[in-house]
């Protein structure tokens, strides 16, 4: 049966090649050689016959840059077999194809292309037995690092790549190489904050009042800071039964042991040693626990408030310039969170906290309502700062949603936004995989481009104000290099408005220039208007 399928596929390929000759502009030309420089591996066949990728260190390229695709024949069993190679991009309206015959003596089949259009470019490989492979390449300008006016963050799980083994590393790369490539990719986007959650207290201290091992955290802090980014440290999670408060020892369940409130004396010893070790590190954001109003903390609100105040006091006493904020609250708009916001307001007024954390993961159908409900609570609590949205993505992480959520988070006065999450891992059951905008090989999807576009236009811009804050029409105004930038988007239905007056250039959510007519449709796909 397989031979029959292959026979018919060869015929189909031959027919397609004939018609392709009539339209040479849509064809791909290949070079086959026995020698190739090392290339970034974007995948390989399960049977080890093929490897494929791009020449370079990451999967992101500048507009107009020549990109070389490499397809390597790794086994003589492919000798003489034919394959169809396709290159497609929705943003660039490209659909090209070509054909190769595998040659064991010249195992590297390569082609090059370039494009001035930002977007995702997908290379597909189809064999005569109908087996298919594909990978994505992103084209977008390399961004300047976002400045400190707003934190554009990611949660890339570099700790897992460094410590948890092959299932969490990039395929074909060791732990250190994986960390470097992850951060190089983040650096290309211009993000200025990395949030990590996988180095808990128990990984650093093995016994009460014992020595603290900073090896992994030193690596993380140094690597992130070397890339010009701040490090969001989630300071929390107890270290095992020996570290929990006495009242919880009889009911201690090891499967959720890290969620119990700690013995405060033992905990504060750990915090003190940590604060002393990083006393000169002002590029760390200290987030005290994660979702203390949810399953990550088994204690009462009052137990968290005590932990929060005492921990913040230790940190601020060590260095008053430390940036400290309360743990991001799950389901941030719930009225039951009011006491948490009130405690944050109290500690901000005491100069023990700089801000409060919250998590709004919702999709665009609820984002506007839930954000404004949360802001009503924070206003009622007396908070004078806008918070840090230190996790956002689970309820919606497609290209338009990530862009709109980042935009609206800043529009409502926050100081930071962390897109959750950054990358998939090889381990399929990993809970981050459904929300990532890079896959396990760091191949980007559309959301990577749109998030980078937010940073491209606004990462070094000053927020001037919100012109319209209606669900179906949000207009934000920024200023960058003396130029006004207005961003139009909707968190609800489409709205048609008159096109802006004046001389300007408009861009779509991928950063590609677009023409405007007398009216524009404002949707959940942001439009950036840059005045000349």
Residue ranges, per PLM feature:
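C-terminal beta-strand-rich structural cap/linker in extracellular carbohydrate-active enzymes
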Residues: 515-532
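Substrate-binding cleft and catalytic face of glycoside hydrolase catalytic domains
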Residues: 186-349
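Hydrophobic faces of well-ordered beta-strands that scaffold small-molecule active sites
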Residues: 152-156, 194-196, 231-235, 284-288, ...
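Beta-strand-rich binding/interaction modules
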Residues: 79-90, 123-125, 493-513
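Aromatic/acidic polysaccharide-binding cleft in carbohydrate-active enzymes
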Residues: 395-452, 466-469
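Noncatalytic carbohydrate-binding groove/subsite architecture in carbohydrate-active enzymes
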Residues: 301-406, 412
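Carbohydrate-binding surface patches
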Residues: 55, 468-502, 509-511
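Mature N-terminal, pre-catalytic/accessory segment of carbohydrate-active enzymes
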Residues: 16-173
